[in-house]
């Protein structure tokens, strides 16, 4: 395994159905052999609680601006002999639902259809925005990517350019004819899971998780052997040293809000989709953090994607303990939402739980039981 470990009042008491991309429902299923060596049995993912858990709830705002999407990237199977890669995405909107809705509907298709031979066109459009964007340089050369047979590099490039293209496509549709005006934006995390053979990742002895991330959503893995949480993403925030260094090369638009939190321009996140061309020129880009994790079958019990409405009030260890003590991924997602509401979540809260091959091997130890009891007892709204 290779992985980068990072050290880094009031919500309605009900649970809404998950908002998911309808475009992926028709191809979102698990295949089972039934009977042995017989025909495939296909079960829709949103009706497979033992494999995928989805739950979301509105915060204090009038509408829930979080969105989720999942499904096979079927077009990519045409170029390989392997099972289709699977796509999971969580998008946390702000200023409206337009951007998170756009991403849940379109980002999977953009990733699926991304032609790396056309990336110069994407960069040309990005550079035409001006300001910070005019000097944006990919973390890898196009020539290296086109000549490479390294699947990790090819996936990182596909995700990198897909995030940039989605950002430009959204702004083209929503930021005209007033290009300098603010428009709704979103942050998000996408996980692509592939296997190294022609089996689905849940049947394979080894698999790879490719992650792309902007903003303050979060991805966690649970180690099957130790039961511990491993964070895969970090928050793109003005307080982050690397982000502050990146932005200070071009401007000094840092300030603090009334709570003492560091902000850049008028936003809390230094990377996001949408938000208007003016912020793009200042450096609030959709350039993603990219991570690839090579895993053996029993390494990880589950992957979870979370919006910051949860992580603001629930620690990583609490999240992982609640999930691993649940009977199924769907029960786990429901339990996370209920607990976040119980301990004072005020923002929209969304949880997506993906069962990984090590689910049955997970270590059932509860490191945060006392902490959760104390927090639940302290908060006036307790279940």
Curated annotation (Swiss-Prot):
Provide the E.C. number(s) assigned to this enzyme.
3.1.3.16
Catalytic reaction list: O-phospho-L-seryl-[protein] + H2O = L-seryl-[protein] + phosphate; O-phospho-L-threonyl-[protein] + H2O = L-threonyl-[protein] + phosphate
PROSITE patterns, sorted: PPM_1, PPM_2
> What residues bind Mn(2+) 2, as annotated?
92, 308, 347
- Main subcellular location of this protein, as a coarse class: membrane
InterPro entries, per the entry: PP2C, PP2C_BS, PPM-type-like_dom_sf, PPM-type_phosphatase-like_dom
How does the record describe its quaternary structure?
Answer: Monomer.
Its function, per the record, reads:
Has a role in the regulation of vacuole fusion.
The name of this protein is: Protein phosphatase 2C homolog 4
What gene does the UniProt entry assign to this protein?
Answer: ptc4
């Amino acid at each position: 395994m290779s992985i980068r470990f990072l050290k880094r009042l009031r919500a309605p008491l009900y649970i809404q159905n998950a908002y998911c991309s309808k475009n992926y429902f028709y191809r979102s299923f698990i295949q089972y052999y039934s009977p042995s060596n017989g025909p495939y049995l296909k079960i829709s993912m949103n009706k497979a609680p033992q494999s995928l858990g989805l739950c979301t709830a509105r915060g204090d705002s009038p509408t829930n601006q979080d969105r989720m999407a999942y499904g096979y990237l079927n077009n990519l199977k045409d170029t390989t002999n392997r099972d289709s890669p699977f796509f999971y995405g969580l998008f946390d909107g702000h200023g409206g639902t337009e951007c998170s809705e756009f991403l849940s509907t379109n980002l999977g298709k953009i990733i699926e259809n991304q032609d790396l031979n056309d990336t110069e066109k994407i960069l040309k459009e990005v550079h035409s925005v001006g300001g910070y964007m005019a000097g944006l340089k990919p973390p890898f050369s196009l020539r290296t990517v086109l000549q490479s047979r390294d699947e990790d590099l090819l996936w990182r490039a596909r995700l990198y350019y897909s995030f940039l293209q989605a950002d430009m496509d959204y702004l083209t549709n929503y930021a005209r004819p007033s290009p300098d005006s603010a428009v709704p934006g979103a942050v998000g995390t996408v996980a692509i899971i592939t296997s190294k053979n022609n089996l689905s990742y849940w049947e394979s002895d080894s698999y790879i998780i490719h992650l792309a991330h902007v903003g303050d959503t979060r991805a966690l893995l649970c180690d099957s052997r130790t039961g511990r949480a491993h964070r895969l993403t970090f928050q793109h925030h003005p307080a982050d040293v690397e982000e502050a260094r990146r932005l200070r090369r071009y401007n000094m638009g840092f300030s603090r809000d009334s709570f003492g939190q560091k902000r850049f321009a008028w936003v809390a996140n230094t990377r996001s989709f949408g938000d208007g061309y003016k912020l793009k020129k200042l450096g609030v880009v959709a350039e993603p953090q990219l991570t690839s994790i090579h895993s053996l079958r029993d390494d990880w019990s589950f992957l979870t994607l979370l919006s910051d409405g949860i992580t603001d009030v629930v620690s990583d260890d609490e999240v992982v303990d609640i999930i691993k003590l649940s009977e199924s991924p769907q029960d786990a997602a429901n339990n996370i939402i209920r607990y976040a509401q119980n301990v004072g979540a005020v923002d929209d809260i969304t949880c997506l739980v993906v069962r990984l091959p090590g689910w049955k091997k997970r270590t059932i130890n509860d490191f945060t039981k006392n902490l959760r009891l104390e927090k639940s007892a302290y908060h006036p709204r307790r279940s």
